[in-house]
Amino acid sequence: MIKVYAPASIGNVSVGFDVLGAAVSPVNGALLGDCVTVRAAKSFSLRNEGQFVGKLPEKLEHNIVYQCWQLFCQHLGKQLPVEMTLEKNMPIGSGLGSSACSVVAGLMALNEFAGLPFNESQLLAMMGELEGRISGSIHYDNVAPCYLGGLQLIMEQGDIICQPVPSFDEWLWVMAYPGIKVSTAEARAILPVKYSKQDVIDHGRFLAGFIHACHTRQPALAARLMKDVVAEPYRTQLLPGFANARETAKRVGALACGISGSGPTLFSICNDIATAEEIAEWLQQHYVQNDEGFVHICRLDLAGARQIG
């Protein structure tokens, strides 16, 4: 029996639209992510469980973990008779890399069970392929950090898909999911077809500056450069209360604040626990809209997906 946990992730991280992603895990040790278990069997079967099992598609062929099994067997060149269990702990359409969690946990668990027939690069390429089928185009900004951990810069240059970016251990990431769903397709459709030359210049400046600040260990500069001129100005209208929450977080003492992926999850970066707790409490009271919403104080998950059973 193999059981794999894949953590939540932040796509874009404000400054790197489609090219930057970060894996996160709560500081209290809670598992914020999906788990997939693989056991030997006479034929394939899939069981779903977990907090958000009710949000999964009813048809087997639409289930991401079933699609993982299909793709894995296709690349393996033979059918793998296994019993799989998806523990769906990630809300769908949350901006926390929910589909990536299932993709990464599913494919990694199958690879471990089969005796590691595929190396890390091959498996990551498979993850990107499947994520592309789900979202309509290949994006690694969730699957790469979810699988490999930490902060990842997506390059897609031949066999080099991504590279790790140094992060700051002192940063705490307050993650607030309001409990509503935002469609990734809708969030992409709202973006302009063309951007001004000034926006392009600013985007390049902020992203290059942020990566430089990370490598040269300048956390204050890195936080100051976490500005999104590509998506946030347009997606804010899809997120009730986001603008007010962002301003409140910064007033309380957040170093930076932004939209996680397509939203509606908000992330806020702090460098001390007292500030993080104050922001988390405010977000719980004012940004979370229902019982499905939650707030977690996290750090970057440097381990990424891992076998836990």
UniProtKB/Swiss-Prot annotation:
GO terms for cellular component: cytoplasm. InterPro entries: GHMP_kinase_C_dom, GHMP_kinase_C_sf, GHMP_kinase_N_dom, GHMP_knse_ATP-bd_CS, Homoserine_kinase, Ribosomal_Su5_D2-typ_SF, Ribsml_uS5_D2-typ_fold_subgr. One of its GO terms (molecular function) is homoserine kinase activity. It comes from the Bacteria. Pathway: Amino-acid biosynthesis; L-threonine biosynthesis; L-threonine from L-aspartate: step 4/5. PROSITE patterns: GHMP_KINASES_ATP. Keywords: Amino-acid biosynthesis, ATP-binding, Cytoplasm, Kinase, Nucleotide-binding, Threonine biosynthesis, Transferase. Its EC number is 2.7.1.39. It is found in: Cytoplasm. Transmembrane segments: none annotated. GO terms for biological process: threonine biosynthetic process. Pfam families: GHMP_kinases_C, GHMP_kinases_N. ATP binds at P91, I92, G93, S94, G95, L96, G97, S98, S99, A100, C101. It catalyses: L-homoserine + ATP = O-phospho-L-homoserine + ADP + H(+). Catalyzes the ATP-dependent phosphorylation of L-homoserine to L-homoserine phosphate. Belongs to the GHMP kinase family. Homoserine kinase subfamily. PANTHER family: HOMOSERINE KINASE, HOMOSERINE/4-DIPHOSPHOCYTIDYL-2-C-METHYL-D-ERYTHRITOL KINASE. HAMAP family: Homoser_kinase. NCBIfam families: PRK01212.1-4, thrB. This is Homoserine kinase. It comes from Photorhabdus laumondii subsp. laumondii (strain DSM 15139 / CIP 105565 / TT01) (Photorhabdus luminescens subsp. laumondii). The gene is thrB.
